[in-house]
């Protein structure tokens, strides 16, 4: 039948046979009647049968289609294609939905979300990550979208820092008005090769007290071509809280936030799962490595009636020293990584 609206399937479960002569649908000429009647002959009826309606088809062919080796623009930090597709799928990427990646990099998550039909946008503190070395977004992330004929799924990418985002945030966390994203998917930087940084200066109070703008040849420094904004070290734990806070202020009701978080296998809560009262953790998938692992955390944006009248905004207390400045002090996982994840008593 062609063009059927509904498909039905029958599954049969058969018992394993020890007969080396059993062939489905045929009877070899050298098999005797005694063999057929023997105890080890193939059963004549299945153990169980299942009858059901076909509601969806597998998309495993997308894994080979999106193989990183076939992409024109990648980097050493590009997320594995299968994991990116799983992330976008768990975040419910689909037609008519707007998805955002605040750490876009080479756009692997955006491509996966666009494959499922979503309209995607991204940002990164370093514009070179999504546009290449001065080549432009068309030859960077855009080349990957063009490679899969998904140009319609790419909105744009901007240079931005999640803690200083120019995007609209809902003023009230208790009302849906002002929230506009249907999904957020990302793989935040772990800060291992170099410490995490955000826009700003180490001593922001001193900088804020300076009068006027810094001028060069009569032009504000930040308006000149090639301007590079100053950056300061930042805590990995606080960044996780920032991601949840950003999601709570931008995701519509029941929308999803999905991101990856590294953790040491024997950690005792130092890097526990971040929480926010406006977000419900619904999935926690673990990818183990040798001495560490990373988790795919998926949250659902709670509806107005599911949140208490006066919830605590920060759902988790961060135990950080107030004078933390170095990359290791701001990122406990980075410190453990370079210590080889040895127990504290084994560290000199």
Where do the PLM segments sit?
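Class I S-adenosyl-L-methionine-dependent methyltransferase catalytic core
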Residues: 3-348
């Amino acid at each position: 039948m062609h063009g059927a609206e509904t498909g039905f399937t029958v599954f049969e479960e058969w018992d394993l046979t020890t007969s080396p002569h059993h062939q489905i649908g045929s009877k070899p000429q050298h098999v005797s009647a005694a063999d057929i009647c023997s105890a080890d002959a193939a059963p004549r009826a299945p153990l169980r049968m299942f009858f059901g309606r076909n509601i969806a088809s597998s998309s495993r062919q997308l894994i080979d289609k999106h193989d990183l080796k076939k992409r024109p623009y990648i980097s050493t930090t590009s997320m594995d294609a299968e994991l990116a597709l799983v992330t976008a799928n768990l975040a419910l990427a689909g037609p008519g939905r707007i998805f955002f990646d605040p750490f876009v990099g080479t756009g692997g998550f955006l491509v996966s979300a666009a494959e499922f039909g979503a309209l995607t946008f991204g940002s990164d503190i370093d514009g070179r990550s999504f546009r290449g070395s001065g080549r432009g977004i068309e030859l960077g992330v855009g080349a990957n979208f063009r490679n899969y004929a998904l140009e319609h799924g790419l909105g744009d990418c901007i240079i931005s820092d999640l803690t200083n985002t120019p995007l609209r945030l809902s003023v009230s966390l208790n009302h849906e008005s002002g929230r506009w994203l249907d999904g957020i998917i990302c793989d935040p930087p772990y800060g291992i090769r170099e410490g995490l940084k955000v826009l700003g200066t180490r001593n922001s109070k001193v900088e804020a007290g300076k009068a006027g703008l810094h001028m060069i040849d009569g032009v504000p420094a930040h308006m000149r071509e090639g301007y590079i904004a100053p950056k300061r070290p930042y805590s990995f734990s606080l960044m996780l809280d920032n991601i949840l806070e950003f999601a709570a202020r931008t995701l519509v009701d029941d929308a999803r936030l999905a991101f990856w978080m590294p953790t040491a296998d024997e950690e005792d809560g130092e890097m526990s799962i971040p929480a926010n009262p406006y977000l419900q953790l619904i999935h926690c998938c673990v990818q183990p490595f040798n001495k560490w692992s990373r988790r795919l955390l998926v949250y659902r944006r709670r509806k107005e009636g599911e949140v208490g009248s006066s919830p605590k905004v920060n759902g988790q207390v961060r135990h950080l020293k107030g004078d933390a400045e170095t990359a290791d002090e701001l990122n406990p996982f980075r410190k453990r990584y370079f210590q080889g994840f040895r127990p504290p008593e084994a560290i000199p």
